[in-house]
Amino acid sequence: VSQTRKIAVVLKGYPRLSETFIAQELLGLERAGHDLVLVALRRPTDAKRHPVHDEIRAKVFYLPEYLHDEPWRVFRSLMKSLPKAGFWRALVPFIRDVGRDWTRNRFRRFGQALVLFAEWPAEARWLHAHFIHTPASVTAYASIMAGVPWTCSAHAKDIWTSADWELSEKLGRARWTVTCTRSGFEHLKSLTDEKSRVHLSYHGLDLHRFPSFEGDHSNRDGSDASDPVRILSVGRAVAKKGYDILLKALSLLPADLHWRFEHIGAGDLTKELRTLAEHLGLAPRVTWHGALDQKDVLARYRASDIFALACRVAVDGDRDGLPNVLVEASSQRLACVSTRVSGIPELLNNDENGLVVPPEDPRVLAAALERLIRDPALRRRLGAAAERRVRAEFDHHSSVSQLSGLFESEWRKSP
């Protein structure tokens, strides 16, 4: 890589099982010759790791998640920073931000930036934030303190739950921002005059980790009680994933259909969803696996007949971008049914390479599920078309090379 600089990548948490797309990108950047150090705002909460995490060589540097957890570390950082001009330069925008957002969270982000500035990773000469909400706040303050430029990857929740004034200011300060869905891209472009600094780049998939499935998906059609159709979903048990809608849709399926549903993923709503499944009389047909690593998830894609995800826009505006699990399932020729939310129609076209239904509508979702359960030929057609699209358009190497090019073009401008 020409003009290479050590990049400090600021992440909300690391490693996280639900963020394989970030780990895959980090590994891709390393393999392209970039020198990284990872700066995480919190320690991992997942007991398991994906194989990709073990392949990333970058050192991980943890900031205090809460300032009161490590008061001496924060105090030392403050004492070290007070004599430096960068601290006072960053104080001005921070005070302005506090005037518009008087929250503990705001003070925490400035404190974390202070620790990053005081304990600066050796030789880091560029900052890159993953997520435009809290990680970008820490990065923006640290950038001013250290006099080091920054860039940003924006995703989904971070875009849709942030105030427009804050997004506009961050887009103006970052050298460039990249995002992973057209809906997010258009929204961010509408908030800045620097439209050429906002870029669209789909994460794509490391297709070596998701090689073509050489076997065949089954001809199950829901008529055999001893061999039910297998429906799979992978995703965190959180509101935006719409698992309550999916369970209600399953409860509306005709009594003569034989199926089983498996869920993979952890999350705050797991207990509530299990209770709902019992209340709807679905418990005997539902398996809750919790979080699994990538190898086990791949095996479940291959053993299943249908992949279902009922994404929605949550009450607070949170929503998915383009859920990576839909790309993964499609790579295994698994017929997918999902909703018309955010970036999902950028992957799935209804009746062409998947079924796409309106969000928040269990009846329409149930009708789509019934079609797929009863018709293995339809599943094969949709699954084959979905795989062709993923392998042609969603290879993560193109995303990594685009990012690499963006970094290098900035470095040529400011040697």
Where does each model-flagged region fall?
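Acidic donor-binding loop of glycosyltransferase active sites
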Residues: 302-317, 334
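A conserved nucleotide-sugar
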Residues: 118, 225-237, 243-288, 295-296, ...
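Acidic anion/phosphate-binding donor-loop and adjacent secondary structure
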Residues: 163-165, 189, 205-227
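Conserved acidic donor-binding segment of nucleotide-sugar-dependent glycosyltransferases
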Residues: 347-351, 355-362, 371-377
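A structural motif in glycosyltransferase catalytic domains
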Residues: 22, 29, 231, 246-247, ...
